[in-house]
């Protein structure tokens, strides 16, 4: 049947979850799409984008770039963006387009790091799953990339998963930190909502 769509993106798909995790980590976030997915993320799924500085961009893929898999053009665009913006890392978030053409995310990550000298993450999301799947993949990649060995710090707790998609607000870290402080924790870290990349590097110090 011509025009039959077997898979439709949910209202808050996995790429939105990935962007929500990375929003406050001072990274250069690239949505690997033609333009529509990035607009939905910034316009509807990420309320912090309106009040804080977060470098979220669309890759602006054209038809032939996607069909032919011209990753070198994407890397060139990212390199030019890095000349104008300061970022602690670069993250490329997948959408249905790279899922259909079979983008090699591992190779893309290496190409970006070689071009820019900045750590790069690639998140293999495809736009057909719910936001929590994208969050899970992103947390995993983030901790694999940046967390280092640390001695455990008694009384320290790390909160994973605090995003506006989960809590419906953008100031929930105050409530969460107060709650766990009342439970007896002396150091409460809320990754990605109030606490940045340094907290991720020290994640192993949590009890």
Task: Give residue ranges: language-model regions.
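An N-terminal assembly and electron-transfer interface module characteristic of large anaerobic redox
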Residues: 1-207
């Amino acid at each position: 049947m011509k025009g039959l769509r077997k898979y439709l993106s949910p209202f808050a798909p996995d790429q939105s979850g990935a962007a929500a995790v990375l929003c406050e980590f001072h990274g250069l976030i690239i949505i690997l799409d033609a333009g529509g997915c990035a607009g939905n993320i910034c316009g509807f799924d990420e309320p912090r984008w309106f009040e804080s500085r977060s470098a979220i961009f669309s890759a602006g893929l054209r038809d032939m770039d996607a069909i032919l898999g011209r990753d070198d053009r994407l890397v060139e665009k990212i390199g030019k963006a890095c000349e104008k913006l300061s970022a602690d890392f670069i993250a490329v978030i997948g959408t249905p387009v790279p899922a259909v053409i079979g983008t090699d995310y591992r190779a893309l990550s290496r190409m970006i790091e070689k071009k820019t000298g900045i750590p790069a993450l690639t998140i293999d999301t495809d736009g057909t799953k719910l936001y929590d799947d994208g969050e899970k993949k992103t947390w995993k990649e983030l901790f694999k990339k940046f967390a280092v060995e640390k001695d455990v710090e008694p009384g320290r707790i790390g909160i994973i998963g605090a995003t506006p998609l989960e809590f419906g607000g953008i100031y929930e870290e105050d409530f969460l930190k107060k709650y766990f402080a009342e439970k007896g924790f002396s150091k409460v870290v809320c990754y990605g909502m109030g606490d940045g990349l340094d907290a991720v590097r020290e994640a192993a110090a949590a009890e």
